[in-house]
From Swiss-Prot:
<protein>
    <recommendedName>
        <fullName>Inositol 2-dehydrogenase</fullName>
        <ecNumber>1.1.1.18</ecNumber>
    </recommendedName>
</protein>
<dbReference type="GO" id="GO:0000166">
    <property type="term" value="F:nucleotide binding"/>
</dbReference>
<comment type="subunit">
    <text>Homotetramer.</text>
</comment>
<dbReference type="InterPro" id="IPR000683">
    <property type="entry name" value="Gfo/Idh/MocA-like_OxRdtase_N"/>
</dbReference>
<dbReference type="InterPro" id="IPR050424">
    <property type="entry name" value="Gfo-Idh-MocA_inositol_DH"/>
</dbReference>
<dbReference type="Pfam" id="PF01408">
    <property type="entry name" value="GFO_IDH_MocA"/>
</dbReference>
<dbReference type="Pfam" id="PF02894">
    <property type="entry name" value="GFO_IDH_MocA_C"/>
</dbReference>
<dbReference type="GO" id="GO:0019310">
    <property type="term" value="P:inositol catabolic process"/>
</dbReference>
<comment type="function">
    <text>Involved in the oxidation of myo-inositol (MI) to 2-keto-myo-inositol (2KMI or 2-inosose).</text>
</comment>
<dbReference type="InterPro" id="IPR023794">
    <property type="entry name" value="MI/DCI_dehydrogenase"/>
</dbReference>
<dbReference type="InterPro" id="IPR036291">
    <property type="entry name" value="NAD(P)-bd_dom_sf"/>
</dbReference>
<keyword id="KW-0560">Oxidoreductase</keyword>
<comment type="similarity">
    <text>Belongs to the Gfo/Idh/MocA family.</text>
</comment>
<dbReference type="InterPro" id="IPR004104">
    <property type="entry name" value="Gfo/Idh/MocA-like_OxRdtase_C"/>
</dbReference>
<dbReference type="GO" id="GO:0050112">
    <property type="term" value="F:inositol 2-dehydrogenase (NAD+) activity"/>
</dbReference>
<keyword id="KW-0520">NAD</keyword>
Length: 336
C-alpha cells in the first residue's frame, strides 16, 4: 500500500524531506507540494525529478482529494493553522518541530485532533529515533545506572543567520532537548531558569551562549548549554548520571587520522547529516504504521504542547532572570 502525501513548505528542511520521501522512504508517494515563495516548490521538484502538483495556497493542497497525509515544514508560525486545517479535513499530519510557537496554538491542534477520535498527528522530534539516543534510553530504562540524578547536554551550532534572535535559542534549538530529555527520563518539568554567560564577542545579534537549567517533577536537574555560533561545528552531547553509574550519548563515528604528531577526527557542520538516519527512520515508522492501519507511535500533539509550555517558561526566564514554574495541566487520557 502507498499513501499519497502533500508537503507544505519547501524550504531547507522541506526540500530535504521531499528528497527523503521520494527516494528513501517506502509506502509513500509525494503528489503535491506548496510554498508561498513563487517557483521554490517547482524548483525542488525539478531538482529531484519529481512530478507533483504545485500549489500556492495550503488550503488547496489540503482539499486535494488525492492528498491523504499532510507534511508540515512551513515556517514555525504557520504550523498550527496548517495542522488544524488538515485535521478538520480528516487527514493525517506529520508536523516538523515545533508543533506551534505558543502553547495556545498547540491546544488548538490538540482539540482538532481529539474531535477526530483518534491519534492523527506526529511531531518531528527526530532525536527519539536516533540510534545513540535509543541506546541511552534503553540503559536508563533498564536500571543499569540506577535512578537518574542529573543530566548534562550540549547543543552547539557553528553559526546561524543574522535574523536569529535570543528567544529562538529556546523555540528552535533547545526545543529538541526539552523533548528528548522528557522522553529519556519519562518525566515532566517543574521549573526552568536561563542564564546568560559571558557574551561571545563574535555575536552581536543575540545573547549567545545561553545556559538552561531544568528541574523535573522528581528533582532531576538538567543543564543544557546552547551556543548557536560556536564556530567549530555542530556538536550534540548528552550524559546522564545515575546512582550507580553514568551513560553517555555516543559520538558520531568518524575516521581518526594520526599524522605529524597529531591525532584528529572530524566534527560535522551540517545538522541534517548528524541526524540523517533518524529522519529516515522516523518517516519510515510513521508511514509503516499508517499503511498497517495503525495510529502514529512517535511524538504526539501533547508532547508538542509540553515542549511549548516549557519553552514559554524558558523565554520568560530569559526576560525576568528568575526561576520560572512550568505550569502544565494533567495529560489527557487521549494521549496516554
Amino acid at each position: 500500500m502507498t499513501l499519497k502525501a502533500g508537503i507544505v513548505g519547501i524550504g531547507m528542511i522541506g526540500s530535504d524531506h521531499l528528497r527523503r520521501l521520494a527516494n528513501t522512504v517506502s509506502g509513500v508517494e509525494v503528489v503535491a507540494v506548496c510554498d508561498i515563495v513563487a517557483g521554490r516548490a517547482q524548483a525542488a521538484l525539478d531538482k529531484y525529478a519529481i512530478e507533483a502538483k504545485d500549489y500556492n495556497d495550503y488550503h488547496d493542497l489540503i482539499n486535494d482529494k488525492d492528498v491523504e497525509v499532510v507534511i508540515i515544514t512551513a515556517s514555525n508560525e504557520a504550523h498550527a493553522d496548517v495542522a488544524v486545517a488538515a485535521l478538520n479535513a480528516n487527514k493525517y499530519v506529520f508536523c516538523e518541530k515545533p508543533l506551534a510557537v505558543t502553547a495556545a496554538d498547540c491546544q488548538r491542534v490538540i482539540e482538532a485532533e481529539q474531535k477526530n477520535g483518534k491519534r492523527m498527528v506526529q511531531i518531528g522530534f527526530m532525536r527519539r529515533y536516533d540510534k545513540g539516543y535509543v541506546q541511552l534510553k534503553n540503559i536508563i530504562d533498564s536500571g543499569e545506572i540506577g535512578q537518574p540524578l542529573m543530566v548534562h547536554g550540549r547543543h552547539y551550532n557553528a553559526s546561524t543567520v543574522p535574523e536569529y534572535k535570543t528567544p529562538q535559542a529556546i523555540y528552535e534549538t533547545l526545543i529538541h532537548e526539552i523533548d528528548v530529555m522528557h522522553w529519556l527520563l519519562n518525566e515532566d518539568y517543574k521549573t526552568v531558569k536561563v542564564y546568560f554567560p559571558r557574551q561571545s564577542s563574535l555575536v552581536t545579534t543575540l545573547r549567545d551562549p545561553q545556559l538552561v537549567v531544568m528541574e523535573t517533577t522528581s528533582g532531576i536537574n538538567i543543564v543544557v548549554e546552547v551556543f548557536v555560533n560556536c564556530q567549530y561545528g555542530y556538536d550534540i552531547h548528552c550524559d546522564v548520571t545515575g546512582e550507580k553509574g553514568m551513560a553517555e550519548l555516543p559520538t558520531v563515528a568518524s575516521a581518526a587520522v594520526r599524522k605529524a604528531a597529531k591525532y584528529s577526527t572530524d566534527i560535522l557542520v551540517d545538522w541534517k547529516q548528524r541526524f540523517i538516519d533518524a529522519y529516515d527512520i522516523e518517516f519510515q515508522d510513521f508511514f509503516d504504521r499508517l499503511n498497517a492501519g495503525l495510529p502514529p507511535a512517535g511524538p504526539t500533539s501533547w508532547d508538542g504542547y509540553l515542549a511549548a509550555v516549557t519553552a514559554d517558561a524558558c523565554v520568560k526566564s530569559q526576560e525576568t532572570g528568575n526561576t520560572e514554574i512550568v505550569e502544565l495541566p494533567s495529560k489527557p487520557d487521549f494521549y496516554k
